[in-house]
Amino acid sequence: MIVENGEWIMQGVDWNDPTCIHSADELEDIINEYGFLPLFANEVEGFSVEEMTDPSYWWSGDTDVDPWEWRAVITRTGKITYGKFFNKKAGFISKKWFPYFANYKRDGYDFDSRYEDGKAEYRENLIMRLFLSSDIELMDIDYKHLKDYVESPELYSFEVKKLAGFGKGGEKNFDGTVAKLQMESYLVVKDFQQKVNKKGEPYGWANAIYTLPEYLWGYDHVTKRYKESPEESHNKILKQLKKYFPNAETEDLKRSL
């Protein structure tokens, strides 16, 4: 998005443009081809869902044509995850490419080790403790029977905020802390759902449902690039991005991540 005369203006292409993405299925194909894709325009021209879609359909509420609604459609496939992965901005990463981001963003650390070494904040730990068992290592979990090991493998955003003690009279900077955990690839969005009232009726805006990437795809898959240095993973991500945006400046490519 760009600002013109104090107003945010969506970028994009006309519906009839041959490069325009028209459906969640088409977007899923593009994400799997690229490996990863931010939602909104960034330092690299053309590298976003925004710039590949018709701006007039955003926030229309029509799942068939609204890219905002496609977030839920795509994450529910279990093949692609969503979160604030790109310079604190939201976007998608495919199952194939997530291990590269995990190794690069985590700098080779599982969360517990990161926290023990003083590289993660107290507030981050409050949130992660909701998802991590205190006596079972992630590598030892049978992910086909996840609920036998973990009480809450997934939680709504509002549940995370409440259970971790954020909000009025409690811990501050919930949004910033959750964004940091996503940027470090420890926390991801697996779906968006509305709240349900006592009658079982959905209401309000759709809420993000958070989980650990290990709970989506297993510890072995998420950490499979730990065998290489974070710098190697970073370089492979840049090489992949450069393949589709060969004219972009290297520094812009780095900033977009």
Question: What spans do the regions from the language model cover?
Answer:
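Long, low-complexity intrinsically disordered regions
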Residues: M1-L257
